[in-house]
Amino acid sequence: MGHNGNSYYIGIDLNDSYAMVSFFQQNMKEPETVSTVAGSEEFQIPLVLARRKSIGKWYYGDEARRLSKSGEMVCIDQLLKRALNSEKIVIDDDSFMAEELLALFLKKVMELPSKLGNPSSFDRLVICVDRLTKENVSMFYGMAVRLGINSRQLTVIDRKESFYYFALNQDKSLWLHDVVMFMQEKESIFFYSLKRDLRTTPQVVSIDCLLYTSDAADEP
């Protein structure tokens, strides 16, 4: 499904609070992250859906959060957790599986790059989550059809693998030595450290992760 030989990729960084969407084509130097507001550098999209009562129209992200303050809207958050728990959500006389609503949210954010003039179809969708489990990998591949793609177009990775790809696609001088990355989520800071073992052939790359909270530092 290449576009004149220029492969087109969409990436979604996902946790239970927000999503971030980026796109990349081979004529670009690096991926570009998109916002729901043109010209804004606020890239975190709240993982929230809202539905107007009796009409059935869905809103997502910041707009859903804002409109949910009205008594006319029903708001659903924690979609990732609810989907993994196979929750059923009842709104008025309608019932939805949380996995179905998570897929609806993902479809909406997947459309953001096309609003910037990019193709509406893409070659690969990469979803990045905190950790890979049998349950979340199975769920995402199971919802591929709902997302309008086939399973061969989908890749699910965790943050360690994402960090690995990011680091080794930088200038070589940046990863000749150890590479570290800090990531903040609410009151916690994640510390990732990438190391290369130069004594082995081929070289072995290892990534360690520490979680720093207000109380202690532990491995997540």
Regions found by a protein language model. Give the residues of each.
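Short helix-terminating capping/connector loops at secondary-structure junctions
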Residues: 4, 117-122, 150-151, 173-175
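Early-domain small/polar-rich strand-loop-helix modules and first-structured segments
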Residues: 1-88, 145, 153-165, 198-207
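Short, low-complexity, polybasic intrinsically disordered segments
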Residues: 134-148
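Short glycine-rich phosphate-binding loop at a beta-alpha junction
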Residues: 120-130
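Single conserved hydrophobic/aromatic residue that forms the stacking wall/gate
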Residues: 212-220
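Phosphate/ATP-binding catalytic cores across multiple sugar-kinase/actin-like superfamilies
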Residues: 104-116, 163-170
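A short acidic Gly-Thr/Ser loop motif
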Residues: 4-5, 12-18, 174-190, 194-197
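Phosphate/oxyanion-binding active-site loops and adjacent basic polyanion-contact surfaces
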Residues: 75, 96-106, 136, 214
